[in-house]
Amino acid sequence: MPLLDSFKVDHTRMNAPAVRVAKTITTPKGDLITVFDLRFCRPNMEIMSSKGIHTLEHLYAGFMRDHLNSDKVEIIDISPMGCRTGFYMSLIGEPSAQAVANAWKNAMHDILTKVSDVTQIPELNIYQCGTFSEHSLEDAHQIARDVLAKGISVNLNEDLTLDEEWLNR
């Protein structure tokens, strides 16, 4: 089985909250797709609650689009990581890591200031959500407060890449 790109970086050296360009792909038609690792928590040290990350998933995707989409950038998807330490964001275009960090910061502000009640969580119903009873706005707010308190940095692949010899052991 091929080794996925996300497992070629040293998770013990990752900063969080932080943005990292995980991968860039040029499609056969010439479109550039960029995948970002949006790391909310330090791997193996912190974790987002299941209910908090689920609520954040419903809110974060929309607010990130509000702040990052443009005539040069269009978010395809933002999905939570199985390890519950962050999200992957795939988009058309190549915004700078700093532009992504700024959008992320603004999205966290929006979560705290624009969503004060669970009735304001988009798609929170049995028809549009696979586990609509598994949410916590309180946890999502705490995650947003933590991100804003810590600040968002940039993780560079060259600082995190695992040694080929170690990978091939």
From Swiss-Prot:
Cofactor dependency: Fe cation
GO molecular function: iron ion binding; S-ribosylhomocysteine lyase activity
UniProt keyword Iron present: yes
Pfam families membership: LuxS (PF02664)
Catalytic activity: S-(5-deoxy-D-ribos-5-yl)-L-homocysteine = (S)-4,5-dihydroxypentane-2,3-dione + L-homocysteine
Enzyme class, UniProt record, top EC level: lyase
Cofactor binding remark: Binds 1 Fe cation per subunit.
BP GO annotations: quorum sensing
InterPro entries recorded: LuxS_sf, Metalloenz_LuxS/M16, S-ribosylhomocysteinase
Sites where the protein binds Fe cation: 54, 58, 129
Highest taxon, organism lineage: Bacteria
Keyword terms, alphabetized: Autoinducer synthesis, Iron, Lyase, Metal-binding, Quorum sensing
This enzyme's EC code(s): 4.4.1.21
Family: Belongs to the LuxS family.
HAMAP family named among the record's database cross-references: LuxS (MF_00091)
Quaternary structure and interacting proteins, as annotated: Homodimer.
Entries under PANTHER family matching the protein: S-RIBOSYLHOMOCYSTEINE LYASE (PTHR35799:SF1)
UniProt function note: Involved in the synthesis of autoinducer 2 (AI-2) which is secreted by bacteria and is used to communicate both the cell density and the metabolic potential of the environment. The regulation of gene expression in response to changes in cell density is called quorum sensing. Catalyzes the transformation of S-ribosylhomocysteine (RHC) to homocysteine (HC) and 4,5-dihydroxy-2,3-pentadione (DPD).
Protein name per UniProt: S-ribosylhomocysteine lyase
Phylogenetic placement of the source organism: Bacteria, Pseudomonadati, Pseudomonadota, Gammaproteobacteria, Pasteurellales
UniProt gene name: luxS
